[in-house]
Amino acid sequence: VTTGCQRYPYDPEKATRPYPSQLAQGSLADIQVIPNINGGTLKLVNATAVSYSNFDLWMNRRYVRHVDALPAGQTVELPIDTFWDERGEGPFPGGWLRYYDPTPVILVQIQSGPDTPLVGLIAKPPDTDKR
């Protein structure tokens, strides 16, 4: 559900829980996160020998989505418009027909359990915008 006066993409039915600020980031994984502005996606490049499964992916300490699997040595692309916050607001995804600049991707973290430390990922600059 989107209306003309909304500042952000908004769907109250997609509201999630708040960012787990009580959890520390315990480690940093060699997984690059590259925004694709024209495609409105996040590319996750797992350069490690570790597979991750059944986790929540946090973006900018605000938006979250569930990810089924990120296999070792593989790349996964996720639509940015599948991330939501606790109010049911989403980031601006980009794309050719966008009205606003895409939400910058600053911090990306894996949460594998409710009480486990977060795993930080490497946020890279976006793919070149050739719009």
Put a short name on every predicted segment.
Residues 2-22:
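Bacterial Sec signal peptide processing site at the extreme N-terminus
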Residues 47-50, 71-72, 112-115:
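A short, structured loop/turn motif at beta-sheet edges
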Residues 2, 33-35, 103-108:
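Generic hydrophobic, helix-prone segments enriched in Leu/Val/Ile
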Residues 23-68:
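Short, surface-exposed binding/anchoring microloops in extracellular/periplasmic proteins
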Residues 61-96:
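Intrinsically disordered, low-complexity Pro/Gly/Ser/Thr-rich segments with frequent PxxP/GP/PP motifs
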Residues 39, 52, 73-75, 103:
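Extracytoplasmic
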Residues 13-16, 84-131:
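Terminal connector regions
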Residues 41-43, 56, 77-79, 107-109:
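Beta-strand secondary-structure signal
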